[in-house]
Design a protein with these regions (language model features):
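Bacterial Sec-dependent N-terminal signal peptides
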Residues: 1-27
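Short S/T/G/P-rich N-terminal loop/turn motif that feeds into the first structured element of a domain
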Residues: 20-272
Length: 272
């Protein structure tokens, strides 16, 4: 399955996530702008059975040309450690109006794929009903320093809450940071998204996809992010960025970071 176009997320979900156009490589295909993420809890003793069941379902419904694309990540740090993030992406809100698809917010009960999930996988979940999030990508924040079509094995999601009325400034700052990361030599990809549903509307999430912890460490190395930012925007801009950042976000607002691992056997796209 190497002839595929891949993007992450999240993020978004998380962001870029893997995505394909009829499972054929199309480097100029539009990337999704909206992601729907379902967070699934499974008891530890049922985790292996759950993963095996989702793998079987994926091979049956989500690996053929023209099939609905679904992607599974496992949270490996943070408050939701051990949970599964099951998601898909669409290019516009109008895509949610399409019939005969599982790639929609409210899947019809008569959908064959949905029925299969309810019969074979739902019994392995802690709850029949799972929390669902909708995230929308902020235009201009996407970047990709990896080869076209390359999936990412890991992802990091950072969430902050802005102050009301700061949307334009928040967008400006996130675009500037994405420009700096895009101009760097870091082998990462990512974007910034905003909660549309399922959480605090003031919440933004920055997704970073990577393939090795060594490469991610270059991003997290103390002081390195400031150097990356100033390499793009000029000397002294990092301090100004931090000062502005503090005025944009809620004082004492909840922040959260979590790391995730991509489960290729439970997803439409395999890793290279």
């Amino acid at each position: 399955m190497r002839n595929l176009i891949t993007i992450i997320v999240l993020f978004s979900g998380f962001t870029h996530v893997c995505f394909a156009d009829n499972h054929k490589k199309a480097e100029n295909a539009p990337e999704p702008s909206i992601y729907v993420v379902r967070h699934i809890e499974v008891d530890l003793e049922k985790a292996k059975d759950f993963e095996a069941a989702v793998e079987t379902k994926t091979k049956k419904y989500n690996r053929k040309e023209g099939s609905d694309l679904w992607f599974t990540w496992k949270v490996i740090s943070g408050p939701r450690t051990g949970q599964y993030a099951r998601l898909f992406g669409v290019q516009s809100w109008a895509d949610f109006d399409k019939a005969n698809t599982s790639n929609t917010i409210n899947i019809p009960r008569g959908n064959e794929e949905s029925s299969y999930w309810r019969e074979n996988i739902t019994p392995l979940q802690k709850s029949k009903s799972v929390p669902t999030e909708v995230w929308m990508v902020i235009p201009g924040t996407e970047y990709n320093n990896l080869e076209a079509g390359q999936a990412t094995r890991y992802g990091a999601l950072y969430k902050w809450k802005m102050k009301p009325g700061m949307y334009q400034k928040k967008t400006k700052y996130e675009i500037q940071m994405s420009e700096a990361l895009a101009a760097s030599d870091l082998k990462v990809r990512g974007s910034v998204m905003r909660f549309e549903s399922g959480g605090d509307y003031m919440t933004f999430g920055r997704w970073i996809g990577f393939n090795t912890w060594e490469e991610f460490g270059k991003f997290r190395e103390w002081g390195n992010l400031g150097k990356i930012y100033e390499a793009k925007h000029g000397k002294g801009t990092w301090v100004k960025y931090l000062e502005g950042w503090n005025t944009i976000h809620q004082d004492g607002g909840e922040t959260e970071t979590e790391y995730l691992e991509y489960l290729e056997d439970l997803s439409s796209i395999e890793l290279d």
